[in-house]
Amino acid sequence: TITLEVEPSDTIENVKAKIQDKEGIPPDQQRLIFAGKQLEDGRTLSDYNIQKESTLHLVLRLR
């Protein structure tokens, strides 16, 4: 599990960048899933109604 400090206004792209900083996984290999939906880079956490303490799933796209 990776814990991140984020704001509701953060974009998915931004969250992926934070994951890269912590784990070294390039954003283009990350797919974030919440409530069964793949999250789009340009949207924000609040667009998806992702709240405090929510858990996202990270799926890696392998080359």
UniProtKB/Swiss-Prot annotation:
The keyword Cytoplasm applies. InterPro entries: Ubiquitin-like_dom (IPR000626), Ubiquitin-like_domsf (IPR029071), Ubiquitin_CS (IPR019954), Ubiquitin_dom (IPR019956), Ubiquitin_ubiquitin-like (IPR050158). SMART domains: UBQ. There is a cross-link at residue 37 (Glycyl lysine isopeptide (Lys-Gly) (interchain with G-Cter in ubiquitin)). The record marks 43, 61 as: Interacts with activating enzyme. SUPFAM superfamilies: Ubiquitin-like. The keyword Ubl conjugation applies. Belongs to the ubiquitin family. This is Ubiquitin. It comes from Lumbricus terrestris (Common earthworm).
